[in-house]
Each structure stands twice: as structure tokens, then as C-alpha cells.
Amino acid sequence: MSKVIGIDLGTTNSCVAVREGDETKVIENSEGARTTPSMVAFTDNGERLVGQAAKRQAVTNPANTLYAVKRLIGRRYDDPTVQKDKEMVPYAIVRGDNGDAWVEARGEKYAPSQIAAYVLGKMKETAESYLGETVSQAVITVPAYFNDAQRQATRDAGKIAGLEVLRIINEPTAAALAYGLGKRDSGTVAVYDLGGGTFDVSILEISDGVIEVKSTNGDTFLGGEDFDNRIIGFLADEFKKDQGIDLRGDKLALQRLKEAAEKAKIELSSSKETEINLPFITADASGPKHLVVKLSRAKLESLVDDLIQRTLGPCRAAIKDASVSANEIDEVILVGGMTRMPKVIETVKEFFGKDPARNVNPDEVVAIGAAVQGAVLKGDVKDVLLLDVTPLSLGIETLGGVFTRLIDRNTTIPTKKSQTFSTAEDNQNAVTIKVYQGEREMAADNKLLGNFDLQGIAPAPRGVPQIEVTFDIDANGIVNVSAKDKATNKEQQIKIQASGGLSDADIDRMVKDAEANASADKAKRELVELRNSTESLIHQTEKSITEGGDKVPAADKSEAEAAIAEAREALGGENLDTLKAASEKLTQAAMKVGQGVYQAGQGAEGGAAPEGEKKDENVVDADFEDLEDDSKKH
């Protein structure tokens, strides 16, 4: 039975883990790292790079290197946060055909789900390489505060990557699952998750294998990327002050600033000051310009203080919704790379009144929890019950544009709720059901998830028809809605597809594209491997001919040299079959050379044996006689 992998699909980095027996293993990628950059690049020769390979070339290819795309997933192009993000990244964020925020590289438009799918594909490949078998099922994590559109888009990404997504699980819940597995102590735990692009906080009760989420809150546009952007802004301002040149309009310079900002941020978690030195950052008529700026930890903290303070609002809301106080929290778990920043740790400690737990790896704990959940779903881990919640209230628009809630936030899922509504006008024969998610009182201020029509209502005065609307949220937090006219029993049911979102046709097209690319990638890798082995074979054959000298039969030597020439010619092309045939031909010729040398050696040795024995006797005699001669001389 194939394994279920757990994937933490992060904004900045991603991680994959698998449950093996009683242990959960974080799997290293092909570069030997336990996390993989969530980056995808498209090169000028049409190659697609994912992970570390994409990150390595980002500085020289900024417009076609896509990162932090998770922040766009499930969002509309007109969303103010998307417009803000457009100003901060060197690649193009464009309007998709469906009105969603998409990205563009090399003239092609891509849905964020598609880019996420390439990252998920890399994680799938990493797991398959380690396990030695095909992987088809996964549990994928999302920020707890993701809405339905963002969850659907993440599930779509899994499908495009060729994965059956068994469960979408909230990141803080996954962390608590990894932390709480095997613990028999009961207690209230807060998970503070500040990652690359999103912030979540969840309050959970852990007791005897039951992990129950009491509340969750967060901000899906707050994370390490924002901290980096503050440093980038500071560096650009300092350079403009010093040189009078604004680097913000230079994509190449912006990408170098981005890398330097990330590096400086990490260094300042362990040192008090760092120097950012970027030679030849730009040039003007007077010549090249260099950026050299010192950044202290204190300065960094002042630049990002408001961002850190922004995390406390959701913390207050979460403990209020969970009906606990900060000092009733027994343990605080830190998740996400940003929680390594000393100021963040200090702020969390002050808020909750206790030191956070130090026994979890903030970069890996979410993937570990996802792998555990995969094992739970497969029945490999028993005595664990996970009770999660819906992060946002769900409801419909009613008369006057009011948002009428059917399911309140922090309701345990899966759940189902029905409510009866009526018509607003006499003889109304159809109603439009508009489904929203959010906490504002007016529907228009919340996130429109989708809408549908219930037709064929029997003519009646306003207020008489009985229309039952039912909301059903599954364990992934994905919403289904139905509406039924009680008089006629006519029912209309939809699985909510975001007002934008990907259609089934879009997903199928992207799946086919991913499969085609996978075949092309496989062929490309096969060609590279064959090139390497053929070049090695040419070298070995030439070495055998040289070392064999006269022992190589002339016919074999001539055949091998012709095969070498043919192989060299095939190496200059791109045809896999031609190279394969040339390589096989050279292999046969090389074997003949080897056999010829071996047989010639055997023949020479067999023919010269008596003479050899005679020679040996002479050598021994000569030695003996020399010694005797010496003794006679003395």
C-alpha cells in the first residue's frame, strides 16, 4: 500500500514528510536540504526550474522567477493586497481570464495554483526518490485563516501536480498534531505561526489523543516577505539618499536587494549587526555604483515593529473566542521561520507570559503533522482524533444587503446547518443565493464565494414561500450549499466554486500540461544522463586503445575509432534515439577492444612460460652467486 505524504506548501519554503512505522521522517531533497524554496523559474531556453535551481538564477532572471505566489492563491486581481504586492515583486502580476490574480513569465500567463502545483510536483518527486515508489496521495497544509476560495485553489494545485489530496489541514493544527502525538498530558496550547507570507494563531485543547481546535485567527497577508520588503525599502532609501538613484525601478537590482534583505534578516537573529555589501548594484554616467550599508538588529526591529504588533490583534481575538485568558495557556508553540527572530520570541513571551516551547523545529513541524494526519487517515496511526474549526463565518446575502450568518466562525467541522428564508416580492419565481464568508455585517464587505439560482418557485405573495438553505462544510473546510423550495421540493445544489477560481476544464488542461512537461522533463533528464555516460564511455575506450597499444587488433581499433566519432557526432545533437544507438554501438566496440587486449595478454603469457621459468631461475641464481662472490671477496 502506497504511503501518504504530508506537504507543508509554504510561501517561502516547502517541506515534505512521511510516516514510517512509529517515526515521522522529513525527506531531504536532491540538494540534500530538508526544505525547498517555493520558487519556479522559466529560462530563456524554455526550461522550467523549481526550488533551489530556480533560486540560484533569480538574480540574473528576476522577471521570470516566481516566488511568494501563495499570497496570490484564491485572490481576485482587484484585491487591494494584490495591488500592493504588484509594486514589490520583479515579476508581472496580471488579471487572469476569470478575474483572479495570475502571474506572467516569458509571455505566458499562469494561475497561482499552477505555480503551486510545480512546487508540489517537486515535493512529490522528492518523496518518490526517497521511498522508491510512486506517490499519489497527500495531505497538504494551508494557513488556518485561508478562506474557501484559497482552500479550493490549493486542492486544485494538488490535482494539477497529480496528487489525490486526502485532506487539507490547517498549519497550526498540523503543528499541534506533531507536538501532541504521543503526549498524554492534557492542556491548552497556543500555536503562533508566522511564516513567509501568512500569520495564524490557534488555541487548542490536547487531551489523551484528542486534539480539539477551540479557535483560530490570523492574517493571510502578513509574514517574512513583509519583513524583507521593509529592509528592501530601507536599503533603497539609503542608496537614493547617498547616490540619488532609486533602485526600485530596476528589476535586477531589486532582486539583489531581496536576496540581501533575506540574508541580513537571518544573520540578525544571531548577531547584533551586519553589513550589506552589493558591488556594482547599478551605474550612471559617472560609472558603477556600489551599495554598502550597515544594519543593526535594533534598526531592523524598529523597521518591523508594527508588523510584529499586528500579530497580537489576532492573538487577542483567538483567546477571546476560545474563552480563555493568556495566562491559562499551558504551552506556546512557535511555527514558521520568522519565529526565530529574537524580537518575535520576546513579544510572544510578553503576551502569553511564558517562554515558548523550544523542542519543535519551526520549519518542519507542519509537514510532520501533515504526514501524521495522512497516517491517521490510512489507519496507520490510531487513538488520535483531530477536531478542527472553520476560520470564518459563512452566510448569505438577505434583504437590504445584510450578511445573515448560518455558520459562525470557530464552529467544529465537518458541520451542517439549515435555515429557512422567503421571497422579497410577490409572485417571485426565482431567487439568487449569494454565499459569503467573513465577519462584516454587510454582505458586500465580505468575501463572495459564489452564487446560484433556485428557479421554479410557485407563485405566492412575498414572505409565503419557504426556501430552506443548507450549508455543509467538510473536513477540509470546503463548502457545499443547497437551496430547496419546500412547497415544490425543487432543489438546487452547488459545490461552491469561487467567483473566479479554476473551472474543471482549466484544471484538466493544467493537469495535461503538467503531465506533458513531466514527460519532457523526464526525456531531458534521460538525455543528460545518457550524454554523461556516453562521454565517460568515449574516454574509457580511448584510454583502452592507448594503453592496449599493439595488443589491440587493427580491425577492433578501427571499429572503435569509428564508433567514437559517431558518438561524438550524436553528442552534438539533441536526438535521444540517435545518441542511444551510437552509445550502444560504442559499448559493443569497447568490449571488443577489451577482449582483444585481454586475449593478446593471455597468449603472450602462455607462450613465454618456459622462457619465463628459465629467466626466474637465472635471477635467483644470479642473486645467490652475487652473494657468494661477495663473501669470497671479503
Curated annotation (Swiss-Prot):
<comment type="function">
    <text>Acts as a chaperone.</text>
</comment>
<keyword id="KW-0143">Chaperone</keyword>
<dbReference type="InterPro" id="IPR029047">
    <property type="entry name" value="HSP70_peptide-bd_sf"/>
</dbReference>
<dbReference type="GO" id="GO:0051082">
    <property type="term" value="F:unfolded protein binding"/>
</dbReference>
<dbReference type="GO" id="GO:0140662">
    <property type="term" value="F:ATP-dependent protein folding chaperone"/>
</dbReference>
<dbReference type="InterPro" id="IPR018181">
    <property type="entry name" value="Heat_shock_70_CS"/>
</dbReference>
<keyword id="KW-0067">ATP-binding</keyword>
<keyword id="KW-0547">Nucleotide-binding</keyword>
<dbReference type="InterPro" id="IPR029048">
    <property type="entry name" value="HSP70_C_sf"/>
</dbReference>
<dbReference type="GO" id="GO:0005524">
    <property type="term" value="F:ATP binding"/>
</dbReference>
<feature type="modified residue" description="Phosphothreonine; by autocatalysis">
    <location>
        <position position="198"/>
    </location>
</feature>
<dbReference type="Pfam" id="PF00012">
    <property type="entry name" value="HSP70"/>
</dbReference>
<comment type="similarity">
    <text>Belongs to the heat shock protein 70 family.</text>
</comment>
<feature type="compositionally biased region" description="Low complexity">
    <location>
        <begin position="601"/>
        <end position="610"/>
    </location>
</feature>
<keyword id="KW-0346">Stress response</keyword>
<dbReference type="InterPro" id="IPR012725">
    <property type="entry name" value="Chaperone_DnaK"/>
</dbReference>
<dbReference type="InterPro" id="IPR013126">
    <property type="entry name" value="Hsp_70_fam"/>
</dbReference>
<feature type="compositionally biased region" description="Acidic residues">
    <location>
        <begin position="619"/>
        <end position="634"/>
    </location>
</feature>
<feature type="region of interest" description="Disordered">
    <location>
        <begin position="601"/>
        <end position="634"/>
    </location>
</feature>
<dbReference type="InterPro" id="IPR043129">
    <property type="entry name" value="ATPase_NBD"/>
</dbReference>
<protein>
    <recommendedName>
        <fullName>Chaperone protein DnaK</fullName>
    </recommendedName>
</protein>
<keyword id="KW-0597">Phosphoprotein</keyword>
